[in-house]
């Protein structure tokens, strides 16, 4: 992703991935900090004119990639893997009304194969 763009379509695709990852990591961080933070207000939910921007929905009401990053992490139960500086950690946030049983499968993926 961090290479030179190969044209307009490639640029749009990679900017979409960046928006998705930005929203996903932001929401996962907020879910992990649930004791200290209980809400979030989005500044740019939608675009007010056709443009490339940091909103979640475009001018025509079509969801952008960031919308799907939000949708995935706004589920009642959300699991994420993060680096706390000492190693990788798994955090599970349960915002449902009760207890839930869960199973997690973790795979380490290289660019060319699963390790």
PLM regions: where:
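Carbohydrate-binding surfaces of carbohydrate-active enzymes
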Residues: 1-115
């Amino acid at each position: 992703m961090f290479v030179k763009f190969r044209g307009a379509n490639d640029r749009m695709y990679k900017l979409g991935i960046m928006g998705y990852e930005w929203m996903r990591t932001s929401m996962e961080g907020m879910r992990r900090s649930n004791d200290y933070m209980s809400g979030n207000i989005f500044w740019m939910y939608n675009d007010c004119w056709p443009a490339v921007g940091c909103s979640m929905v475009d001018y025509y009401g079509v969801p952008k990639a960031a919308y799907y990053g939000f949708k995935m992490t706004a589920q009642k139960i959300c699991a994420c893997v993060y680096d706390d500086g000492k190693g990788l950690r798994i955090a599970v946030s349960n915002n449902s009304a009760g207890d839930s049983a869960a199973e997690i499968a973790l795979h380490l993926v290289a660019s060319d194969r699963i390790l």
